[in-house]
Every structure is written in C-alpha cells, then in structure tokens.
From Swiss-Prot:
SMART domains cross-referenced by the UniProt entry: 7TM_GPCR_Srsx (SM01381)
Gene disruption: observed consequences: Mice display increased locomotor activity and less immobility. Mice show elevated tissue dopamine levels in the striatum and an increased dopaminergic neuron number in the Substantia Nigra. They also show an increased neuroblast-like and proliferating cell number in the subventricular and subgranular zone, indicating increased adult neurogenesis. Mice lacking Taar2, Taar3, Taar4, Taar5, Taar6, Taar7a, Taar7b, Taar7d, Taar7e, Taar7f, Taar8a, Taar8b, Taar8c and Taar9 show no visible phenotype or behavioral deficits.
Record's keyword terms, sorted: Cell membrane, Disulfide bond, G-protein coupled receptor, Glycoprotein, Membrane, Receptor, Transducer, Transmembrane, Transmembrane helix
GO molecular function ontology, one term from the record: trace-amine receptor activity
Family of this protein: Belongs to the G-protein coupled receptor 1 family.
Topological domains annotated Extracellular: 1-36, 89-106, 172-195, 273-287
Protein name: Trace amine-associated receptor 2
Length: 339
C-alpha cells in the first residue's frame, strides 16, 4: 500500500479523484437488484459445478475419458464462480476496486487464465468426440486416461503461463500513453491491452481454438448425418453406442455454442478497443465481461437439461445417499439409456 501511495504523490491524480472511489450514481434499489442477480448467478455457478465435480468424482460409472474432461471443465467454472465473480460483483456494483493493485493483477490473471482454460477444454472435448464418432474403432486406443491427463496438463499450464506472464510483466500495456498515471491514480483496477497483445489474445486465445472447434464439430455432424442413413442396418449394440455418442456430441456442441456466444463480445472488444483509442465505455466492457461469466452459470444447467444421469446424481447428493458405503457403484443409467 505504501508504494501505491508513493505513486500517487509522484503523479497528479486530480483528474482521477486522487485514487478515491467516485460517488456511486446508482440508486440503492438498482444496486440491490444488481447484487441479487449477480449473487444468484454466483450461487448457481458454484453449487451447480460443484455438483458436477462430486458426481463425476464419486460415481464409478462416470469415470470415462470424456467425463474426465467435463470434470476438469467444471473445476474451471467452479473456480471462476468461487474466486473471480464475487470480487467482480463488488467492483461492478460499487464502481470501485477495494482490494489493492497487487490483488487486482492476481484477480485479472486468474480471470484471463480461466476463460482461456475453458476454451482449451472445449477443444479437447471436441477432439474426444471426433474420435468417438468419426473413428470409433480407434477411440479406445487414442483417447485413453493417460492421453486425457496430458491434454489437461496443456489445458491448465499454457493459459496459466500466458495469463500470469502477460499481466505481471505488464507487457499488455507497453506503449499505452498515460497508463502509468491511470494505474497509480485510478480506483477501478484498470487493465488495458495494447494493439499487439489485444490482437494476440484474440487470435491465440479465442479465434484459433474456436475455429478448430467449429471445424471439428462440422466434421462430426457431417459424419453423424452419414451414420444416420445406415444406423438401422447395424448390430443393436453398435447402433446404440453410436446413438449415445451422437447425443453426447450434440450436448457438448451446445456447450461450445453457448461459450462462443457468451465470450465472443468480450474478446472482440479487447481486440478492437486499442484501435479505437480505448473509447469503449467502462460500463459496456463490464457488462460484456459478466455476459462471459454467465457461461459458467449456464453449463451445469445445460448438463442438467440434457443428461438424465446428472439429475439422478444431483438427487442422490441432495438426499445424502453418497455418504452410504458402496453407493459409488450405483447405476445412474436407465435400461433405455444403456441399450
């Protein structure tokens, strides 16, 4: 805190209110409504994804390579809800960052890391579904648990190294005129990407993996269409497995679509803002960020709607049956679903 105060003495902070929080122009009713909506989203994000984590971890029937990827993605969403969204809620409603400059960087690093980690997970899931549907005979040898673990290592380590490296080196702000004064004097936890890093983040962290996902799912659904024409002539067990794989691909394709819908506006704004002389209103950027956060709220709702086994697992968790001995061997699939 002392270094922050020293910076304020070095710069003329009169334009920025000398680092103090501006008077909140929102009425008490508006703030209460914002807190209620955001707290509800945080609650669903934390406990919905926690239920998914417990379900896949506890029930042995769910220990598959695909579900291991979904488990890790649920951990990503849970961490976003638990460690990022509460602080962002206070900043958004109160129009002020109360937690200091160092924690601002830590917070933004985790925020950036988790959003990129999510898209890396979705790419991995797309690859998993590609082998399951397009190359089913090779699936068991290509998508083994050790392979999935290596994929998860990449999904977490690369975004983490990128996010913390860029934010703490402050490379993202090189060449931005007046940024030092803004950081020293502002009370809003300002993070602004220059043209180079804004473009790099959009291309490497969003556009390229998104394009890969869309291409892979396009191939998956093209192959699924071919399978649909011959599926009735297949042996019953192979027929049923293909139907299950197709349904799983459809569900995870919806998860991918919701992710792209929620996060594209935020990433696109990060790309454009430095070319528009950082003219994006703070309120708009804040709203787009929360629109991205809501993706992590939507995921457990999507799983609950499309996966009957998740609804059953949630019921068992709420009833406390998971504390019974040997309950982890319970069958979560009906006869119709396993056929």
């Amino acid at each position: 805190m002392a270094s922050f105060e020293a910076q304020q003495e070095t710069f003329d902070c009169s334009e920025y209110g000398n680092g103090s929080c501006p008077e909140n122009e929102r009425s008490l009713g508006v703030r209460a409504a914002m807190y209620s909506l955001m707290a509800c989203a945080i609650f669903i994000t934390i406990f919905g994804n926690l239920a998914m984590i417990i379900s896949i971890s506890y029930f042995k029937q769910l220990h598959t390579p695909t579900n291991l990827l979904i488990l890790s993605m649920a951990v990503t969403d849970f961490l976003l809800g638990f460690t990022i969204m509460p602080y962002s809620m206070v900043r958004s409603v109160e129009n002020c960052w109360y937690f200091g400059l160092t924690f601002c960087k830590i917070h933004y690093s985790f925020d950036l890391m988790l959003s990129i980690t999510s898209i890396f997970h979705l790419c991995s899931v797309a690859v998993d579904r590609f082998y399951a549907i397009c190359h089913p005979l090779h699936y068991c040898t290509k998508m083994t648990i050790p392979v999935v673990r290596r994929l998860l290592l990449v999904c977490w380590s690369v975004p983490g190294a990128f996010a913390f490296g860029v934010v703490f080196s402050e490379a993202y702000a090189d060449g931005i005129e007046g940024y030092d004064i803004l950081v020293a004097c502002s009370s809003s936890c300002p993070v602004m990407f220059n043209k180079l890093w804004g473009t790099t983040l959009f291309v490497a962290g969003f556009f390229t993996p998104s394009s890969m996902m869309v291409g892979i799912y396009g191939k998956i659904f093209a192959v699924s269409k071919k399978h649909a024409r011959v599926i009735d002539n297949l042996p019953e067990n192979q027929n049923n497995q293909m139907r299950k794989d197709k349904k799983a691909a459809k569900t995870l394709g919806i998860v991918m679509g919701v992710f792209l819908l929620c996060w594209f506006p935020c990433f696109f704004t990060i790309l454009l803002d430095p070319f528009l002389n950082f003219s994006t209103p703070a309120v708009l950027f804040d709203a787009l960020t929360w629109f991205g956060y809501f993706n992590s709220t939507c995921n457990p709702l999507i799983y609950g709607f499309f996966y009957p086994w998740f609804r059953r697992a949630l019921k068992y968790i709420l009833l406390g049956k998971i504390f019974s001995s040997h309950f982890h061997n319970t069958n979560l699939f009906t006869q119709k679903e396993t056929e």
